[in-house]
């Protein structure tokens, strides 16, 4: 079976400085794949290349067999790709309800949108509790739940997550991690997870790619990488 997402020899530059060097990777249907590495390793650049926020210089990006490099972001949403950016970018003055509905901007069947909204609220009960509250008044963890829920409102096939644990209290990090596992398992949504907390990323993903200075340094099954001495030394801060 053809992979859902394929990167083939992708190179990306910021001005004359390379961000990605000959990167090749795959995400299969129903799979969670993690991208780990230090700041500046190229993890977020991969997501920006997928979503069209950065134009690649060479290589190909395919989704369901179709080339998507160069396509506008709204077209990618319609194709089934949703992005949760780093930094919990909610609309702070808008209510939780209106933030969620913004995620369904490409959908026109009101009944289906209402069903999706109810499913999102069932998955994140805190959002139901704060349904009429301004998003900017919620905690960081609650806002992260909100932007994940907003992405799910588009009914994606592939969910891109950029540093979902960043700046969140430890208990809520675990809640977010469990939510990612449940979304993948229950809704059959494929997930490409960028996460600097490599330990959590490897525990909730099936496979992973470790990046260094814009290139893939290591890849494999996440369970195996968790016990790889090179990964422990470079990405996990020593022994688990």
Q: Can you describe what each PLM-predicted range is?
A:
Residues 36-38:
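The feature captures the beta-strand-to-loop junction immediately N-terminal to the Walker
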Residues 51:
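Helix-to-loop junction immediately C-terminal to a conserved catalytic motif
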Residues 59-68, 79, 112-117:
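Conserved ABC transporter NBD signature motif
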Residues 151-152:
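ABC ATPase C-loop
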Residues 174-188:
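Helical segment within the ABC ATPase nucleotide-binding domain
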Residues 15, 33, 55, 71, ...:
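ABC-type ATPase nucleotide-binding domains, specifically the catalytic core motifs of the NBD
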Residues 155:
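Conserved catalytic motifs of ABC-family nucleotide-binding domains
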């Amino acid at each position: 079976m053809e992979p859902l997402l394929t990167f083939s020899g992708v190179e990306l530059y910021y001005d004359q400085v390379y961000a990605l060097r000959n990167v090749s990777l795959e995400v299969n249907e129903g799979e969670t794949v993690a991208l780990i590495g230090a700041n500046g390793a190229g993890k977020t650049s991969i997501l920006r290349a997928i979503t069209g926020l950065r134009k690649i210089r060479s290589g190909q990006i395919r989704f369901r067999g179709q080339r998507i490099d160069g396509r506008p972001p709204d077209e990618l949403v319609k194709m089934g790709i949703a992005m949760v950016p780093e930094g919990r970018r909610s609309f702070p003055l808008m209510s939780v309800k209106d933030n969620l509905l913004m995620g369904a901007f490409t959908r026109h069947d009101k009944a289906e949108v209402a069903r999706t909204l109810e499913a999102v609220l069932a998955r994140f009960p805190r959002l139901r509790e704060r349904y009429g509250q301004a998003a900017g008044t919620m905690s960081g963890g609650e806002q992260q739940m909100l932007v994940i829920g907003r992405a799910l409102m588009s009914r994606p096939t592939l969910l891109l997550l950029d540093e979902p644990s960043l700046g969140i209290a430890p208990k809520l990090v675990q809640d977010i991690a469990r939510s990612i596992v449940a979304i993948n398992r229950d809704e059959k949504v494929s997930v490409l997870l960028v996460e600097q907390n490599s330990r959590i990323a490897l525990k909730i993903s099936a496979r992973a790619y470790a990046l260094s200075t814009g290139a893939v340094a290591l890849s494999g099954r996440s369970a195996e990488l968790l016990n790889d001495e090179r990964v422990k030394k470079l990405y996990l801060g020593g022994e688990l």
